UniProtKB/Swiss-Prot annotation:
Protein name: A-type ATP synthase subunit F
GO biological process, one term: proton motive force-driven plasma membrane ATP synthesis
Subunit note: Has multiple subunits with at least A(3), B(3), C, D, E, F, H, I and proteolipid K(x).
Gene it is expressed from: atpF
Species in which this protein is naturally found: Methanosphaerula palustris (strain ATCC BAA-1556 / DSM 19958 / E1-9c)
Family stated for the protein in its record: Belongs to the V-ATPase F subunit family.
Length: 100
């Protein structure tokens, strides 16, 4: 299972430096949508990391698909959703509340 990261070049740089190979630079909304569609179809990806501002720019239907996705589990970083959203996603993905 691999981690994929989609975002602007500044957002994905740290993930590249940490050794994540599947990083995709999205310079505009069209590229963002293309990369997300591609990653959702990749059976090797277990976690998809997005910038929360990119997530907010997506059409509501795609946002809903990503929010409800279990494989890959989609994590939006940097927004006001905070720990509760991440907690719920991990609980849904793993089946156990790791915070308890």
């Amino acid at each position: 299972m691999e981690i994929a990261v989609i975002g602007n070049s500044e957002f994905i740089l740290g993930f590249r430096l940490a050794g994540i190979r599947k990083t995709y630079a999205a310079t505009d909304d069209e590229r963002l949508h293309e990369h997300i569609t591609s990653v959702l179809q990749d059976p090797e990806v277990g976690i998809l990391v997005l910038n929360s501002t990119d997530m907010e720019r997506l059409p509501r239907r795609l946002q809903s698909t990503l929010e409800n996705s279990v494989r890959p589990t989609v994590i939006a970083i940097g927004g006001s959703e905070g720990d509760m959203s991440l907690r719920e996603k991990i609980k849904r993905s793993v089946g156990v509340d790791l915070w308890k």
